[in-house]
Each structure stands twice: as C-alpha cells, then as structure tokens.
Amino acid sequence: MPNTSDPEKGLFLAGLEAHYSARDIEGRILTAIRAAGLEPEQRLSPEELGALDHFHTGGLRASRELLELAQIRAQDRVLDIGAGLAGSARLLAFVLGCRVDCVEPSADFRAGAALLNRLTGLDDRIEVHPGNALELPFADDSFDVVWMQNVGMNIADKRALYGEIYRVLKPGGRYAFQEMAAGDAPTSYFPLPWATDPGDSFLVSVDEIRAGLGDSGFIAELLEDTSDAHLSQTTAYAAPSPLTLGVYVDNLAQKAGNARRSLEEGQVRLVRGVFRVI
C-alpha cells in the first residue's frame, strides 16, 4: 500500500488520484453501455467493451499486439500493474483463460474494473487490488508475467519500479510493457492522458529504459519504437459510439490531441518491450 508518511510522496499520490478520478464511474459506465444498445444484464464480451476500457495509446489493438509478443500461456499467473478498468486483464483472461491479478491505485478505477469484470463473467479469473507499483502487495517469485501499459510515465523512481517487478517475477518470468518514452525535446503540451502538468510526467529515453532494466537483472527479448506505426494507423480521437474513453476521462479530446501532437513532433516516443528475468 502507498506509504504517505513522506509529505511530498503523499501530495504526489493525491495529485495522481485526482488525475485518474471519475466520480460515479459505475453509473457512467452503465449509462454508456445502454446507450450503445447493449444490455448490462446479459453477459458482455471484452471485445464489445474494447473502445471503453483500454486506457492507453493504441487501445485494444495495442493490447492484442502486446499479448502476442508476450507469449502468455493459459497456465501463467499474470500481474497487471496500473490496470485501470482492467480491460487488458479481461482480454488476457478471455482469450487465454489465465488468471490475472491487477494493482490499481485509483479507487474509482477499481470500482469500474470490478463492475466490468462482473458484467463479462470474468470476476472469477481477475482480482483487483489496491496498491501502487513501488510497493506491490505480493510475495517474491509470484508471477510468470508482469504486464504494464502506459504506467511508467507516472513513476519517477524507475530503479525501484524495475526492482519491484523483478522481485515478484518467477525465475524465467517475463515483463511485457508499453510506455511513452522521452523524445528529442521536452514535452510541452499539457494536459496529457497521463499527466495534468509536467510535475506528473516522468519520461526517460528508450536507451535509459533498456539500461535501467538491464541493470535490474533483465534480459531484453524485444524493445522497439512503434511511434511511426501508431501514427500511420490512427487518426485523431473520435467518438463513433457512446463507448469511449470519454465516459470517464475528462477533457479527452484535448489530452489525446496533445499526446498526438507530442508524438508527431518527436517530443515523446511510443515503445514496447518484452524482457525476461534471468
């Protein structure tokens, strides 16, 4: 659990909680589901919810691609750090049948995740825990795979982050991730999907990610920059249906527009990787 005895850390966590807060998230989700012509009382599929619950760059498409790269098996125990509404966890549980533990610091997002797990009938395979990435509430050597999408940008202490991930992975375990990395110039457009202002954004370069993970005992299996591919495959965010991130993300158009502009101008880079514990 977060240790807020450090005043500065407590203030930062409070600011992060505010950034990822969504009042009455369960009511918003249910309203959006019905507006999309779906019945919450009937079992929903993760695919139907894909535009709503994958709060990271590339959405459901990016999650599917990372799933393939990570080579997760049905028998694997998976930890999703910073799981949000647990969209990726449901995808993994639905497609592969594996069990997934989620750690999510936002109480609102945990409530939304629990609702969607129940509506998809996957609440027996997914458990959502309070906590944060630097103090994971699990024993050493607990997981075959740690999964993380667009979370590290909010964490300043990368060494501690990588150390915790290494700690909870079993020998031979894999860390599969997607992150925004620092580009050629400082990020100047705010708010962004992950940060209201510069004080919440802690980007490092691709080389620093590789070096930091290597220093923590990981071996790189894959680390690639997918910025250009992402920009060529997507356009500015639109709202083709009621099921969008805008259901619970305030000022989505502005945040998404700033993120795209930052990518186009090279201020940030979109990267993904799979690293293995020795």
What does each of the following model-derived ranges do?
Residues 145-157:
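A short SAM/SAH-binding and catalytic strip from SAM-dependent methyltransferases
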Residues 180-200:
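Short, glycine-/aromatic-enriched active-site segment of Class I SAM-dependent methyltransferases
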Residues 39-40, 56-74:
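Conserved alpha-helix/loop element of class I SAM-dependent methyltransferases that forms part
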Residues 222-278:
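Conserved Class I S-adenosyl-L-methionine
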Residues 134-145:
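A short acidic, Gly/Pro-enriched loop at the edge of an enzyme's catalytic core
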Residues 1-35:
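N-terminal auxiliary segments of SAM/dcSAM-dependent transferases
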Residues 77-81, 85-135:
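Class I SAM-dependent methyltransferase SAM/SAH-binding core
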Residues 159-174:
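A short glycine-rich, Lys/Arg-flanked "PGG" loop and its adjoining helix->strand segment in the class I
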